[in-house]
Amino acid sequence: MQAIPMTLRGAEKLREELDFLKSVRRPEIIAAIAEAREHGDLKENAEYHAAREQQGFCEGRIKDIEAKLSNAQVIDVTKMPNNGRVIFGATVTVLNLDSDEEQTYRIVGDDEADFKQNLISVNSPIARGLIGKEEDDVVVIKTPGGEVEFEVIKVEYL
């Protein structure tokens, strides 16, 4: 497997979720399975089957997170010298030259992306267009809604 780029915050969130799943959720599910077994016949026991299904989802998520963390290339952008260039983990303020709107994005890994919080995946069209650009650069980015022209206003390594 290839390295998965991830910010320090993203890796911390995954570790927290993994800890929660292992220390809280897994024991809850095991207890639910044990309780459902006490009700007798497992073939027609809906509680048992539901708990087993939850166990499958939980164990699958644990394996998924462990795989991502073992292949993660954690990048702490705050430790890098800010040369004004857009890189993975950077917070970028751009001016949409078509709508004259200023927008701020943080370029993060796929698992961390949340457009509502302005966290965009490094593999998104906007991030791919901005990577490598510097302050005052103008770039035309092909988005699902058509071509959009942006000017890079500010690049921060927060």
Swiss-Prot record:
InterPro entries hit by this protein: GreA/GreB_C_sf (IPR036953), TF_GreA/GreB_CS (IPR018151), Tscrpt_elong_fac_GreA (IPR006359), Tscrpt_elong_fac_GreA/B (IPR028624), Tscrpt_elong_fac_GreA/B_C (IPR001437), Tscrpt_elong_fac_GreA/B_fam (IPR023459), Tscrpt_elong_fac_GreA/B_N (IPR022691), Tscrpt_elong_fac_GreA/B_N_sf (IPR036805)
GO BP terms in the entry: DNA-templated transcription elongation; regulation of DNA-templated transcription elongation
Checking PROSITE patterns in the record gives: GREAB_1 (PS00829), GREAB_2 (PS00830)
An example of a GO molecular function for this protein is:
DNA binding
Gene Ontology CC terms, in alphabetical order: cytoplasm; cytosol
Q: Say if the entry is tagged with keyword DNA-binding.
A: yes
Top-rank taxon of the source lineage equals Bacteria
Question: Per its UniProt record, what Gene3D superfamilies does this chain match?
Answer: Transcription elongation factor, GreA/GreB, C-terminal domain (3.10.50.30), Transcription elongation factor, GreA/GreB, N-terminal domain (1.10.287.180)
Summarizing the function annotation, the protein's role is:
Necessary for efficient RNA polymerase transcription elongation past template-encoded arresting sites. The arresting sites in DNA have the property of trapping a certain fraction of elongating RNA polymerases that pass through, resulting in locked ternary complexes. Cleavage of the nascent transcript by cleavage factors such as GreA or GreB allows the resumption of elongation from the new 3'terminus. GreA releases sequences of 2 to 3 nucleotides.
Q: Which family does it belong to?
A: Belongs to the GreA/GreB family.
- The protein, known as: Transcription elongation factor GreA
Organism encoding this protein:
Escherichia coli (strain K12)
